[in-house]
Amino acid sequence: MTDLAPLLARVRLAVFDFDGVFTDNRVWVNEHGEESVRFSRSDGLGLRRLDEVDVPYLIVSTEPNPVVQARAAKLRAECVNGVDDKLAVLEERAAEAGVAFEDVAYVGNDVNDAACLGAVGLPVVPADAWPEVVPLARWVLTRPGGDGCVREFCDAVWEAQR
């Protein structure tokens, strides 16, 4: 990861997909149609480390799901969900923050993240990312989605910037 240190030190905005990054990309549905997903609590502690080094973060999800909003609220993370064009949201938020794309990190796991992964300075995927997007990544995390990959990323940014 030594070659990533300069990129990690430059991160001024971190953007995360939700399903497959904060979750293991599975969903449980009960007989009433209510959905449940599994999270890693360590990911929330990782976001606190981004707070410590003043790196803002955002969750962007294509799913218009109350579970996404509820988890984002608990994590005190800004969240935009129900989005068809993630890249447009990324462009808007980077412009609002005055952050160049080369100083943005994006963590995503699937083909609907490809445009964002291809646009930023530090494209990152979980260990279990869909094979089609792995070549777009500058960094393939060792942890899978929903099992500490957000924490792994946040810890590395924190270490590079503290």
Where are these regions (language model features)?
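Non-catalytic pre-domain segments flanking phosphatase-related domains
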Residues: 1-18
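Short coil/turn segments at beta-strand junctions that form active-site/ligand-binding loops
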Residues: 10-12, 55, 102-103
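A positional/architectural concept
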Residues: 22-52
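Short, basic/glycine-rich phosphate-binding loops at helix/coil junctions
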Residues: 23-30, 67-75
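Mg2+-dependent phosphoryl-transfer enzymes with acidic/Ser/Thr/Gly-rich catalytic loops
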Residues: 33-40, 74, 79-80, 87-162
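Substrate-recognition element of Asp-dependent hydrolases with the DxDx(T/V) motif
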Residues: 47-71, 80-81, 117
